[in-house]
Amino acid sequence: MNLILMINLFLYINGLDPVLTLGSLAFVLILISLPFSFWNVGENSNSSIVRILIASANILLAIQLVFRWIQSGHFPISNLYESLCFLTWGLTFIQLLIERTFPYPLIQAALTPISLLSIAFASFVLPDELKASSSLVPALKSNWLVMHVSVIMCSYAALLIGSLLSLVVLLSSSRETLQIRSNSMGIGGFKNKSENLNIVKSIDELIPITFSKSEELDNLSYRTITFGFLLLTFGLISGAVWANEAWGSWWSWDPKETWAFISWLIYAAYLHTRLSRGWQGKRPAIIAIIGLFIILICYIGVNFLGIGLHSYGWFL
């Protein structure tokens, strides 16, 4: 905390807003990492440089959010600028977790641009009045703000990343056919429907199934989307409880709530096709990509309308 206060004091002495400065620095780091991430795809190698840059940007965004929390006196997710910075933090954090367990260069190339676009939009597109810290209206002065909004934003980050991984699966599976028939949780892992489960005398008799990169990406996408879907479900429930406490209504069907519910239905359909129908590869990937656009409409598109309880009211 002393280090954060020292950085804050240094920036103020030099006439710089610490929140905006740290956001811009995070943008620069992610921008520098972008060409390296694409270069690594051609070289078929995973770059530690990209991981270091993304991790540094993630730390800067975390410090930035702490600064804004100190400035405003409330959890920093009350306007579009703060939520975009929080979203970028979530995107970079999940990317780092994924790369740690699955160091595949195509992941860096697929996920880095969405973080760059998010922080660039926040830093250079939004007007100054939406970047400024502001006090909360009485209805938002609740512990539900932290629980509901942070969970929803983390769900957006996970669903966006999972959907982008599905896009990679769709592109890569056009050159190879996924053979595994399972629900991506290790159940029913047979390549042919005619194969039966037989009792073996020893583990040595079992023939391991090797997974291609597209199969591993498909499984990774499924797990990431599942995590995001659970967060979205919890976020919608907590939002309904909060709305009932604040406005006396569980659900008002304003644009944000409507599109959030549509997003939930799309990803519920995605999980249903995988768990119940056994779909793998291209078909569920298409559903996830549809969900990607729905999430973007839910998060950014609603602000074009400028109406509803959840709109930041910038565009119109």
Curated annotation (Swiss-Prot):
InterPro entries: Cyt_c_assembly, Cyt_c_biogenesis_CcmC, Cyt_c_biogenesis_CcsA, Cyt_c_biogenesis_CcsA/CcmC. It holds the Pfam family Cytochrom_C_asm. Its main location: membrane. The keyword Lipoprotein does not apply. Keywords: Cytochrome c-type biogenesis, Membrane, Thylakoid, Transmembrane, Transmembrane helix. GO terms for cellular component: plasma membrane-derived thylakoid membrane. It is a multi-pass membrane protein. GO terms for biological process: cytochrome complex assembly. One of its GO terms (molecular function) is heme binding. The chain crosses the membrane at residues 19-39, 47-67, 77-97, 106-126, 151-171, 224-244, 258-275, 285-305. It is found in: Cellular thylakoid membrane. The keyword Membrane applies. May interact with ccs1. Required during biogenesis of c-type cytochromes (cytochrome c6 and cytochrome f) at the step of heme attachment. Belongs to the CcmF/CycK/Ccl1/NrfE/CcsA family. This is Cytochrome c biogenesis protein CcsA. It comes from Prochlorococcus marinus (strain SARG / CCMP1375 / SS120). The gene is ccsA.
